[in-house]
A protein has these predicted regions:
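SAM-dependent methyltransferases
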Residues: 86-87, 91-113
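Short, glycine-/small-residue-rich phosphate/pyrophosphate-handling segment
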Residues: 39-95
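Glycine-rich, flexible loop/turn motifs
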Residues: 14-17, 25, 68, 74-75, ...
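Helix-loop-strand module that forms the ligand-binding subsite of alpha/beta enzymes
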Residues: 1-59, 64
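Short flexible/disordered coil segments
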Residues: 26, 50-53, 71-74, 104-113
Length: 113
């Protein structure tokens, strides 16, 4: 890819998209961008949203992980005692931003008051 991009995120990432990326095929611009990220060693964060997971889903997640992608499940934490749905969303978004190297204050860090 000739475009200089530091990092990519696909959020949400369907299992269809994840499977396509895992197989190395490309049928749209999202698949192409993910393929370029992997081949050029750039940060790629995939945020799957589906559950339960089949063996095929798990194998595809392992394939993209081994290729260098980060698989970040859209599974919020609860230790920060969320009060609203937005708190759960911000938790997942904050984790994604962390993986992309983007500073954020969406949730309290461990040990912060």
């Amino acid at each position: 890819g000739s475009a200089k991009v530091d990092a990519y995120a696909i959020c949400p990432c369907s299992m269809g998209t994840l499977g396509t990326i895992a197989s190395g095929t490309m049928s749209n611009l999202i698949h192409r961008a993910a393929s370029v990220a992997i081949k050029e060693g750039r940060k790629l964060v995939l945020v799957p949203r589906e559950t339960p997971l089949s063996d095929i889903h798990l194998e595809n997640m392992l394939r993209v992980r081994r290729a260098g992608a980060v698989v970040l499940m859209a599974a919020p934490g609860f230790y920060h005692q969320p009060q609203e749905i937005g708190d759960l969303i911000e938790f997942v978004v904050g984790r994604c931003l962390d993986q992309l190297g983007i500073e954020n204050r969406l949730t309290k860090r461990w040990g912060q008051e």
